[in-house]
């Protein structure tokens, strides 16, 4: 979990901007849950005003109200939970240029439930029309919620609602509450209704219909429902949004309480989820909510509310955002499976797995054995290494690898093997992605060094599905010990005696030469002190089979 995202962003060069309008417009009650849209460089925000002040007892909750830790403080003459919406235009520095209350009087009817008005409206422009779209619950006596699409007209005279449509749920329209659908900014009249698994609906304001157009079966292993939050925006070849999660419960005094969390979700063009962040809070409050996300020049702007009493814009520089979420939108993943993209992205771009203890430095000579589509090599380009050698045998991956690295690395389309030449089939215990049934070139590590006139390697990253034992063999020992400074990578024990014996041979002729190294299991347990326990290694190898890998970090 990312605790206090705002603090993390501020420490790395981002900024936060409060959204405040005159108190005579609000009578001093809450402002919250803003959304944001940019149209031809003009920045617009929908700011929710609630006719109450919410109180929530935080931390150890030593000071709850008589109504429990969470309560609403209303004006004496109106105890309903009433919402109004203001449209703000912002200056380039995110200060407020203008503020106008949305005039809804043309379409208002007497409410028949206690939650009144359009709640958590997202502002969007579709087909050259401006809309506020959120949930309304005041049209039935039991508070049935439905998303509404309210067209607004913005002029010098102000903001007016000119049409209002209550969107039916897809199918039988018999659900109780539909809310927090996330409008897809670049797809008019489309919403992400559910995230996990993903459901996308298309609404038709002319024929008054709503239908599901995407129904995915992919299910993330997350223990809370992923509910809607921000709008969905394009990000390179992907789409990204912010969801929210809630833990609701009743205390021992039968009072309602909750925790809110948020999460970044990235979809590909076919609505497969390729990456999600850890859950996070904005400023450590239990009650926070985000309705807005937009790309603005070199930044992302996130709008969020704090305890229904304050509204903010968080500005995140794109580079910081990519580091936090661990995903590079300019990186070409080719035809890699969605699940594998998520794994590689998290390991390399987010967790910096191979640089956990020793980092690539400016001027280093780096060798990336098992480069795949180039994620690790790509991730270190901004460190300005002197040279990168990226070795990848798969003919299927090589074009994508070249497109990612171009002339920034020496790309070698060969497999490290016990001999130099050509092979027609995959060796037992060695997996080359999507290369089965085709020829591939092989080269010994010794010949690789000789052909490329490599005198030293500052940083060796190796993950080549069993081929590591053809690097760390008897023949190469002297050169490796004398000329490689940092070694990091994955060693495969699999579940066969041969692989286990190869690992023990590596251990006995290499690890015994190093005094500064660490070994971790795939679930990040430090097992350095178990490496010379043969019974442990036997159980590890045969018990985990295809998960029987270890990560080793060596400082030579």
Label each region the model flagged.
Residues 1-328:
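Beta-propeller domains
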Residues 325-556:
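Phosphate/nucleotide-binding beta-alpha loop and adjacent structural elements of enzyme active sites
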């Amino acid at each position: 979990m990312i605790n206090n995202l705002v603090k993390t962003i501020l420490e790395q060069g981002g900024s936060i901007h409060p959204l405040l309008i005159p108190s005579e417009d609000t009578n001093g009650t809450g402002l919250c849950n803003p959304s944001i849209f940019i149209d031809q460089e003009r920045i617009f925000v929908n700011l929710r005003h609630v006719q109450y002040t919410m109180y929530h007892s935080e931390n150890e909750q030593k000071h709850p109200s008589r109504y429990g830790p969470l309560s609403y403080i209303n004006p004496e003459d109106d105890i309903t939970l009433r919402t109004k919406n203001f449209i703000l235009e912002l200056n380039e520095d995110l200060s407020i240029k203008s503020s106008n209350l949305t005039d809804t009087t043309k379409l208002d009817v007497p409410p028949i439930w206690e939650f009144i008005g359009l709640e958590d409206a997202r502002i969007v422009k579709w087909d050259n029309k401006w809309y506020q779209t959120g949930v309304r619950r005041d049209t039935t006596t039991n508070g049935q919620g439905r998303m509404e699409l309210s067209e607004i007209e913005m002029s010098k005279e102000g903001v007016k609602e000119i049409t209002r449509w209550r969107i039916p749920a897809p199918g039988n329209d018999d659900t109780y509450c539909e809310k927090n659908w996330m409008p897809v900014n670049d797809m008019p009249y489309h919403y992400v209704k559910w995230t996990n698994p993903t459901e996308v609906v298309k609404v038709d304001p002319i024929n008054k219909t709503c239908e599901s157009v995407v129904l995915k079966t992919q299910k993330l292993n997350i223990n809370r429902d992923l509910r809607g939050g921000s709008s969905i925006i394009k990000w390179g070849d992907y789409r990204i949004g912010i969801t929210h999660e809630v833990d609701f419960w009743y205390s021992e005094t039968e009072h309602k309480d909750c925790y809110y969390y948020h999460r970044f979700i990235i979809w590909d063009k076919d609505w497969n989820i390729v990456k999600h962040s850890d859950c996070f809070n904005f400023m450590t409050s239990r009650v926070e909510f985000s309705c807005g996300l937009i790309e603005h020049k070199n930044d992302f702007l996130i709008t969020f509310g704090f305890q229904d009493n304050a509204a903010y814009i968080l500005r995140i520089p794109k580079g910081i955002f990519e580091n936090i979420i661990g995903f590079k939108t300019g990186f070409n993943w080719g035809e890699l499976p969605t699940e594998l993209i998520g794994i590689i992205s998290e390991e390399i771009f987010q967790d910096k797995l191979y640089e956990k203890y020793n980092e690539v430095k400016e001027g280093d000579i780096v060798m990336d054995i098992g480069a795949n589509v180039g994620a690790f090599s790509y991730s270190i380009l901004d460190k300005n290494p002197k040279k990168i050698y990226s070795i990848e045998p798969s003919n299927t991956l090589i074009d994508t690898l070249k497109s990612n690295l171009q002339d920034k690395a020496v790309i070698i389309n060969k497999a490290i093997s016990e001999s130099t030449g050509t092979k027609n089939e995959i060796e037992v215990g060695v997996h080359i992605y999507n290369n089965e049934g085709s020829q591939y070139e092989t080269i010994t590590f010794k010949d690789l060094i000789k052909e490329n006139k490599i005198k030293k390697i500052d940083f060796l990253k190796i993950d080549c599905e069993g081929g590591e034992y053809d690097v760390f063999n008897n023949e190469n020992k002297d050169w490796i010990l004398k000329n490689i400074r940092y070694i990091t990578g994955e060693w495969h024990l699999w579940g066969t005696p041969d692989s286990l014996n190869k690992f023990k041979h590596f251990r006995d002729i290499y690890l015994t030469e190093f005094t500064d190294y660490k070994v971790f299991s795939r679930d990040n347990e430090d097992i350095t002190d178990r490496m010379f326990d043969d019974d442990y290694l036997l159980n590890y190898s045969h018990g985990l089979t295809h998960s029987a890998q270890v990560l080793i970090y060596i400082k030579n």
